[in-house]
């Protein structure tokens, strides 16, 4: 189940929304499944694309603070774009992708990339990466959603995570108008 939280309401001040999100994730109850059916916590944090750098800076600060041992949880930050690029590089697909796009077009390359990454499957490369790299007692931040579009769409990530990934609350950050 994907839910919103009071910091997801429309507010004019992004800094205030980020402050509210930061306070919320630091509460012990945030890491507990507390819904009607004891579902995992999935949260969406949308922001105007022009505020991307401010959001990135806040996430970096939170991660650095967390790495210093300031919290009683681990903050696991994953950039979905970086996961996709790393996969393509490890398989030596990057140059092939560039050539394929030149010959067949962008729409065809998005389809071609989604097949080996299993974007539509519960065992997608992204879900597997998140499962393998998320420690116990963690909060997961998903970033890079805007950079992946339209190759990978955020709802596919959430659908796949909902089926296969239940050990940590997930906060997905994505730019939206």
Roles of regions detected by a PLM:
Residues 80-84, 146, 173-177:
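Short beta-alpha junction loops
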Residues 149-165:
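Conserved Walker B catalytic segment
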Residues 12-67, 75:
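Glycine-rich P-loop/Walker A and Walker A-like loops and their local beta1-loop-alpha1 context
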Residues 162-177:
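Short, flexible loop segments at boundaries between secondary-structure elements
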Residues 135-151:
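Conserved P-loop NTPase "ATPase switch" module shared by AAA+ and STAND
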Residues 122-134:
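Mid-core helix/loop region of P-loop NTP-binding domains shared across ATPases and GTPases
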Residues 49-54, 83-85, 116-121, 146-150:
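Short acidic, S/G/P-rich loop/turn micro-motifs used as interaction or catalytic elements
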Residues 75-123:
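Long, charge-dense
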């Amino acid at each position: 189940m994907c839910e919103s939280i009071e910091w997801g309401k429309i507010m004019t001040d992004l800094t205030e929304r980020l402050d509210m999100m930061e306070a919320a994730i630091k509460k012990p109850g945030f890491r507990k499944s507390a819904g009607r059916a004891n579902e995992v916590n999935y949260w969406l944090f949308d922001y105007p694309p022009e505020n991307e750098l401010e959001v990135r800076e806040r996430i970096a600060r939170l991660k650095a603070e967390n790495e210093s041992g300031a919290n009683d949880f681990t903050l696991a930050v994953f950039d979905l774009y970086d996961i996709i690029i790393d996969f393509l590089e490890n398989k030596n697909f990057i140059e092939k992708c560039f050539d394929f796009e030149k010959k067949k077009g962008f729409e065809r390359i998005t389809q071609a990339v989604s097949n080996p990454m299993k974007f539509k499957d519960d065992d997608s490369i992204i879900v597997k990466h998140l499962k393998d790299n998320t420690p116990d007692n963690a909060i997961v931040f998903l970033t890079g959603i805007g950079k992946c579009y339209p190759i990978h769409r955020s709802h596919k990530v959430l659908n796949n995570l909902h089926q296969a990934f239940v050990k940590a609350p997930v906060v997905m950050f994505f730019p939206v108008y």
